[in-house]
Curated annotation (Swiss-Prot):
SUPFAM superfamilies: YebC-like. Pfam families: TACO1_YebC_N, Transcrip_reg. GO terms for molecular function: DNA binding. This is Probable transcriptional regulatory protein AZC_0510. The keyword Transcription regulation applies. Belongs to the TACO1 family. HAMAP family: Transcrip_reg_TACO1. GO terms for cellular component: cytosol. It is found in: Cytoplasm. One of its GO terms (biological process) is regulation of DNA-templated transcription.
């Protein structure tokens, strides 16, 4: 499993214990507002907004918060956010992609650079590591509600490339340009997915020792804790022992 997915699994469990929902809701709301401003405020006519709302629902964000974020897009006091992708190397030479929505490019760049430097890594130029990743569409369904074999058959028929299953979820993977069509076909058969959107997926992962793994997890956690950072993806793989330790 790639470091990014492992990190998400670990933080999902920790998040419930630490009750750090307000920061997460703030990031989800920002994406909803930006998506609504860039297109129509109707999720049925705006794929990015629909994806943002699905992500918010998956984290149990209150409906009022979601509606408020959509309405904010039409307000005169709506801040202007820039979408920026940072790329760099973390401890052990691991490739890291950071996606941000910021109202101050200089501030965010300075903060992200300092995180990389303090971790023993370095921030590089855009394009420095993204060639090591594939940009894909991903649609996630609850494993308890959707049969894996039925989903695989329907997904391939709809034009998807593969389905990755775990105990909790089934993830349908497809080409970026096929996402809307595949999602529509699967929703008609299985109902609304937990999540749907574009992801970065490492072509290969690097197995790191536990010391390096802990340093990388601290870097990713620090990046995720920044208000402007929306997503962090990396190409490392942790040992099962370290995963268990970090999840405890």
């Amino acid at each position: 499993m790639a470091g990014h997915s492992q990190f998400k699994n670990i933080m999902h469990r920790k998040g419930r214990q630490d009750a750090v929902r307000s920061k997460l809701f703030s990031k989800l709301a920002r994406e909803i507002t930006v998506a609504a401003k860039m297109g129509l405020p109707d999720p049925n006519m705006n794929a990015r907004l629909r994806a943002a709302i699905l992500a918010a629902r998956a984290e149990n964000m209150p409906k009022d918060n979601i509606e408020r974020a959509i309405k904010k897009a039409s307000g005169a006091d709506m801040e202007n956010y820039d979408e920026i992708r940072y790329e760099g190397y973390g401890p052990g030479g691991v490739a890291v992609i950071v996606e941000a929505l910021t109202d101050n490019r200089n501030r965010t760049a300075s903060e992200v650079r300092s995180y990389f430097t303090k971790s023993g890594g370095n921030l590089a130029e855009t394009g420095a590591v993204s060639f090591m990743f594939d940009r894909l569409g991903a649609i996630e369904f609850d494993a308890a509600k959707v049969n894996a074999d039925d989903l695989l058959e329907a997904a391939i028929e709809a034009g998807a490339d593969d389905v990755n299953s775990s105990e909790e979820t089934h993830e349908v993977v497809c080409a970026v340009e096929s996402l809307a069509e595949v999602q529509k076909a699967l929703e008609a058969k299985f109902g609304e997915p937990r999540k749907a959107g574009l992801v970065w997926r490492p072509q290969n992962t690097i197995a790191v020792d536990d010391e390096t793994g802990e340093k990388l997890m601290r870097l990713v956690e620090t990046l995720e804790d920044n208000d402007d950072v929306q997503n962090v993806t990396a190409n490392f793989e942790l040992s099962e022992a370290l995963m268990a330790k970090l999840s405890a």
